[in-house]
Amino acid sequence: METAMCVCCPCCTWQRCCPQLCSCLCCKFIFTSERNCTCFPCPYKDERNCQFCHCTCSESPNCHWCCCSWANDPNCKCCCTASSNLNCYYYESRCCRNTIITFHKGRLRSIHTSSKTALRTGSSDTQVDEVKSIPANSHLVNHLNCPMCSRLRLHSFMLPCNHSLCEKCLRQLQKHAEVTENFFILICPVCDRSHCMPYSNKMQLPENYLHGRLTKRYMQEHGYLKWRFDRSSGPILCQVCRNKRIAYKRCITCRLNLCNDCLKAFHSDVAMQDHVFVDTSAEEQDEKICIHHPSSRIIEYCRNDNKLLCTFCKFSFHNGHDTISLIDACSERAASLFSAIAKFKAVRYEIDNDLMEFNILKNSFKADKEAKRKEIRNGFLKLRSILQEKEKIIMEQIENLEVSRQKEIEKYVYVTTMKVNEMDGLIAYSKEALKETGQVAFLQSAKILVDQIEDGIQTTYRPDPQLRLHSINYVPLDFVELSSAIHELFPTGPKKVRSSGDSLPSPYPVHSETMIARKVTFSTHSLGNQHIYQRSSSMLSFSNTDKKAKVGLEACGRAQSATPAKPTDGLYTYWSAGADSQSVQNSSSFHNWYSFNDGSVKTPGPIVIYQTLVYPRAAKVYWTCPAEDVDSFEMEFYEVITSPPNNVQMELCGQIRDIMQQNLELHNLTPNTEYVFKVRAINDNGPGQWSDICKVVTPDGHGKNRAKWGLLKNIQSALQKHF
């Protein structure tokens, strides 16, 4: 068999073998020596007649494999997929099944197609299954789908109301929008809010990069092939040479993409040794371009407005606002998102117990009701002559009470189950977001995710304690005593449990001080009352003239997770079983909250060191706060000393106590040295558990600073230990 020729791809130009009048690229299969192995890029948009698929197993992975009737097998072609997919996928030909080809003087004149066959997937040449559908039981995919078309899209755009829609749905909304002289009015299909957008064919909305990354990751893990048609992930070309070769590195200092030859030619000089180089990434470069100023890059984050800023945005629209760098903003928002997830995890266990308890209680109603009915019937047979009317009343009361109680429990179980399922999807979405290393993509949605989780916590209600009481307890009948004094001791019967109506009670506001502080500032301050034990004067720097031990710390104080002042304060309200006529504001029986504390004071639980910033002679360490009460933190740090032969020892450098923040900055460290940190929390009951050790290596002074992000991994280990 001859070697296959790759048509219209980087390895071969199609002009060498195809007529220039060829209007359909699928025709070029006839000009290849092996039609089953020909690949070329897809020239059509999504959902057109011609179907292509990206082949990762080909010689040129940037090419696309065409499933076409010009191949040796006109019915279907096997498409190679990624290693994460277990099955091969087949596509029925759609572009050339019913093709009419016209030649004129030996040259191709025209091609007409009339195929409308749908895309199918299967596992063999003869077996063809239905189109792959989105799993209905996935909570995460509900947050990845476009809310308007309910489809997975790689690119979605954020409306000012923070809801994301795909580009097709936005174009559809724009087509039917009300148009004025300078703008058109878009109505969000989720919240029905109106937004005035500039009248332009260009998309004026910011792209939701985090949503796109998570959707692409979900497609890769679950075997969806649509992510392979993403045209935004093409090769990055060199910005210096005229040959437009593929870029090898990106110079952060020059802000240029360079191929290998240009990199050696222009950056081999001694004056450019300080330039910083990174791998080329189309996603990173697109994300950091300001949507309002395309020539400027995003460099800072505004705390006041929760916006990403370039240099022009900062001085034009956010002058005087509290702005921080992107890496510091990622630290803040990651801590806030972790706090919101931890809040929900802290009460999820109790919610599950409540749901299980009511399911068991609901199933036991029938058996308990039959037993009670028999007891009542036998008792009233002895007293029928004088208690016939009373018997009727008691039976009606029990039946009505049982029906009313079941309705209340069914209503609580249904509403709470739906809310928990919704929150599970949101939590899964947030965990996937914490895996993201892109700063802009993460910061676009971090604050939104925190607000959504906290709103979900406020609207999840705890059941009314009256629902836990069995209905038979309201009819305490003792027929021996009733026989002797029936007229005096006959009970009046239980009071009817009042319905709460269809409206949900208004919850109390969430106490955000129960977990990690929302805001972490990065200005350094010194503490004069801390106990610091150091190995030598070269380890820590002290600037005070009275020579008191001081270390640069973060300025933001942490709000302690103190016990609420009222027993009704917490994170969740009760599900009410009050009367229909009773207003929500006047009912005090259901304004009770789930609590993080179980009533008994404990020593602090383990904490997690979630980020470190390392400089040649300084280091910043950030850690989380346990759910228990905390008075202060204590840190120990060691220097790792290696002596021959292969003998590694850790020498204590310092012990810092009475730390009132959740971060610490150390100065005058030795460059190119490995240090080990560990932190624990302390309260009135004593010190808690030490955190897992965190190893850092200070740079030698010539390289760039290092930032260690292990947030998601540390969060998962901490949650497994705590819950």
Curated annotation (Swiss-Prot):
Residues 434-492 form the COS domain. A zinc finger (B box-type) spans 235-280, 285-326. A zinc finger (RING-type) spans 146-192. One of its GO terms (biological process) is protein ubiquitination. Keywords: Coiled coil, Metal-binding, Repeat, Zinc, Zinc-finger. Residues 603-701 form the Fibronectin type-III domain. Residues 382-407 form a coiled coil. InterPro entries: COS_domain (IPR017903), E3_ubiq-ligase_TRIM/RNF (IPR051051), FN3_dom (IPR003961), FN3_sf (IPR036116), Ig-like_fold (IPR013783), TRIM42_RING-HC (IPR042765), Znf_B-box (IPR000315), Znf_RING (IPR001841). PROSITE patterns: COS (PS51262), FN3 (PS50853), ZF_BBOX (PS50119), ZF_RING_1 (PS00518), ZF_RING_2 (PS50089). One of its GO terms (molecular function) is zinc ion binding. Disulfide bonds: none annotated. It comes from the Eukaryota. Pfam families: fn3, zf-B_box. SMART domains: BBOX, FN3. Zn(2+) binds at residues 290, 293, 313, 318. PANTHER family: B-BOX DOMAIN CONTAINING, TRIPARTITE MOTIF-CONTAINING PROTEIN 42. Belongs to the TRIM/RBCC family. This is Tripartite motif-containing protein 42. It comes from Homo sapiens.
